[in-house]
Amino acid sequence: MATLVSDRKKSARHNGRPAPELIFGDLWEYDPAPETADPKLKARYELFINGQFVAPKSGKYFDSLNPATEQKLASIALANAADVDAACSAAQRAYDNVWGKLSGRERAKYLFRIARLLQDRAREFAVAETMDGGKPIKESRDFDVPMAAAHFFYHAGWADKLEYVAPGRRVAPLGVVAQVIPWNFPLLMCAWKLAPALAMGNCVVLKPAETTSITALKLAEIIQDAGLPPGVVNFVTGAGETGAALMAHPIPAKIAFTGSTEVGKIIMRSLAGTDKKMTMELGGKAANIVFDDAPIDQAVEGIINGIFFNQGHVCCAGSRLFVQESVAAKVITKLKQRMKVLRVGDPLDKNTDVGAINSKEQLRKITQLVAAGVKEGAEIYQSPGKLPAKGWYFRPTIFSNVAMSHRIAREEIFGPVLSILTFRTMDEAIEKANNTAYGLSAGVWTDKGSRILKMSTELKAGVVWANTYNKFDPTSPFGGYKESGFGREGGRQGLLDYCKLA
């Protein structure tokens, strides 16, 4: 609800003066619109092994914090190597005795049930996701939860059609799959990983991120309600030691990891010489490229969405903006105007555009890299307005006059920070965009179809969006090149990474 601060003052137009620039907060005050649905959180969450919630063998727990308030949400079980072994053994038994013998048609029924049950509890899951991760409720509500359900629906449709995954070849499940997911999209990454593995006939041991385990464990409740046989899906929670134990366990035939490039390299080194199959979805430093014939207003919205969606906690975030010189000043001006109306604050407020940074450690990293950008001579602009006194927040930030050698142009910041560079020709844009260790995604804004086709061919990125950004669909494969990883997730191509061919 909006309230006019003062309707007694005569307007600028009435006084014959130019109308002032409208900035939220100058003329209007917005009442909070908090989400009030009960997330139904438990005080303590146990491990989910062999179809049951069980206490960790060590008896140890760690706290899950709300990044918007820094308050404890719940205690989470800390799994050790013995817990991981129990989970892997349960998954192997389930595969040998039940899941591996089921027809695709029967497996599909379970996946459909999970999708429908998730839809039934969508609002509850959205609130839990926002409280645990810090993202705005409108993103959890409108993207994360619906997309998670969509992945289960989509892969349920594939479960009885697997002969078409690789026509002319015989496909078979791998057995037990170990999966490790990040903290930026906890529920969606669960669905992203679980759905194709289960559709193909594999059993799973999944480790959520340490800071965002709650929605994975709530999903375990749905898995119980859906009646999945015990051991088909197992969740082990903990820190790096838990993940290392899972990666090193001899039972899983495949490792699926989404996270930082640094950790991905450690995992690959540890698995060198083994016969385990791997997919790695790692970091990114995506180029968002705007040509002078682009629809500028539409491009500005795409740029804002590309970098500030989920506080920039997105591996494919458009964190490097390349603008053709002739329109650079115009684009930067419009970006600043748009940033002035971004609302940063309580993630549970439906008006909020940018929520809380996921953890204190991530906030520290963002702050350090922004300071490096200032020190190296880039020109900084940050959105105005007050930040909440409590919680981990960072202002949406853009840097202009950035050089390719600057750290902010080379390193993944994983926060709401945009580096702006310019180019003159298409060839220069391609060369600069490809001058990175990463190759996950890119965006192109132009009116010319021929230019889009050439750019999508020349850019070394797994996904290229044209006149849009951050568009995802379960039917479309997602993955990168170079230090952004290998393998694909989603679509028919994603299923290939969860099977063996004969």
Outline where the language-model segments fall.
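Hydrophobic face of amphipathic alpha-helices that form TPR/SEL1-like repeat modules
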Residues: 2-68, 155
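Conserved C-terminal structural/oligomerization subdomain of aldehyde/semialdehyde dehydrogenase
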Residues: 2-11, 69-74, 228, 252, ...
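Residue-level signal for inorganic ion chemistry
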Residues: 70, 107, 129, 201, ...
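Glycine-rich loop-to-alpha-helix module at the N-terminal edge of alpha/beta enzyme cores
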Residues: 71-162
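Short, well-ordered beta-strand elements within core beta-sheets of diverse protein domains
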Residues: 72-79, 96-100, 179, 288-291, ...
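Rossmann-like NAD(P) dinucleotide-binding subdomain of oxidoreductase/dehydrogenase enzymes
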Residues: 161-298, 351, 423
